Each structure stands twice: as structure tokens, then as C-alpha cells.
Amino acid sequence: MPTAGKASWRELLRQGEHLLRRRARPDPCEDAGTDAFLLMQAAGGPDRSHYPLQKNDPCPPTLREKYLALLRRRAAGEPVQYILGEWEFMGLEFKVGPGVLIPRPETEQLAEQAIESLRGRPKCRVLELCGGSGCIAVSVAKALPAADITVLELSPDAMRYLRENIARHGVKNVTAIQGDALCPPPGIAGPYDAILSNPPYIASGELAHLQKEVQKEPVMALDGGGDGLKFYRGFNTIYPKMLAPGGLLLYETGEEQGEAVAALLQKAGLREVRILRDAYGQPRNVLGYAPEKP
């Protein structure tokens, strides 16, 4: 890195990107440029709106050292989201850190689909399973303020972030309950107008082959059992019967799991079962509806 006190922000940013690309081998940082900029900003550097005017300004030595420390953490494989302590989902900022699954852009499709499906039921009851940081529930609650939303989460670490994010966004219509989604506590009872989940769906044997950053996330939020379908099978015996007539069951799935999960929903008697593809054409969500009253 350049000599302390003499480097401009532009020089530091270029050096930071180089450091991430070089030290992240053999698992390279695909977004080295973006990560280097975000960490520079977190260290006290200019944001994107001010960078063009300030990029040639010298960086104070104290901020340079702070930036270097953040870069080293990222180069060692720590997710940039954990380093920053928050991440955006559906235009909202959520607190994240070790012990909770990081919100991902592809999961926004689940939240968007839920909101679209429930707009005609403004006072709906919604249950989310394996709620993690609360990004899905809070996003739905902000869009549907009259909805009554319950979030079930087992992990004590994730519950801390879940409750903090509920409070942070001031959504009074979201209730967090700690419990096992495969053995729901007594407070979980239908009928629900929608049941949503982004459950663990990575096959156990694949966990060791995940990217270094993903391996820093909690195993219990990733491990879906031998074939990745453990939670879908377990949910299938519990939650379809908790749906109100015409109620929605909506899951996120792995790219190779759509057909298997759709078959489970059909087996449970749901109708209009569909597999939804993401922006890249990959299967991403499976949904189905409870039968209407005869």
C-alpha cells in the first residue's frame, strides 16, 4: 500500500481492489472492486456521490489504517456483509453478522411474489418459517401494514438480529417467536393466508464445497439434509393444513429442487402449483394454493 498520509482515496481504492484479488486466491473475490469501495466508505472514505470530487484528496493515516484492517478481514474470507454489519434487501437496510444468513438479491423474488399475491387481502395473516434476519417478513410488513405477520426462527443468534431488525424498521405488525419450524410451538396455529419460507436447502455433502464466504454463514441456515429436501418434506406434513381456503404456500428452493418441491405441494393437495424462475432463468420459487371452500 502507498506511504501513510500521502495516498489519495483513488490510490487506496485501487490498491485495496488489488489486495482483495491477490489474497483471496484460490477462491477469488468476484466483487473485489465493489467490496473495496464499500470498505473504504465504511472506514470513513467518501461515498459514491462525493467520490468524484474527493478521490484525489489525501487519506488521513488513521482512516488508512482502519481501511487496511477491513481489507484484511475481507481478504481472509469474512463476508463483506458481516464486516459492514448491515446489508440491503428490498431497498431496506438490515443488521447482519455472524450467526445469521445474509440476505440475498434472489430472495427478493419471494418477498415480491408474496406482496403481489396478498395485496387483495390487506388484513391477511402471514407465517414465515426460518425467518433469519427478518428481511422477508419486514419487507412484506412494510408493503402490507395491515397484515398480521408471525416469524418463526430457532437460532438464538438469528433471533437477536430478527428482533433488532423488527425494531429498527418499526413494524408493529411482526411478531418473532423462537421455535423449531419442524416442531412448531403451540402459538403457531392457522388459518394463515400465506406461509412463506426460505429454508435450509443445501445438501449436507455440498457444504464443504461452498465458497469460503458462504462457509462463514451458520450451518443450520444452510444444511438441508442429505438431498437438501429435509425441511420441505417436514413442512409438507404440517403447514398445508394451516392454510386458509385459497391460502398461499411459497418457498425458495435450490436450482435443481423445483420439480421435487412442486411434487410435494401437489401431494399435499395444493392447487395451481407453479415453479417460478429468477432473472437468470433458473428455478427459484415454488408456490401453491390451498383449495377454496367447496
Protein language model annotation of sequence segments:
Residues 1-48:
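Non-catalytic accessory regions of SAM-dependent methyltransferases
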Residues 201-231:
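Mobile active-site "lid"/loop adjacent to the S-adenosyl-L-methionine
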Residues 106-208:
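Conserved SAM/SAH cofactor-binding pocket of Class I
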Residues 39, 77, 107, 136, ...:
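Residue-level signal for inorganic ion chemistry
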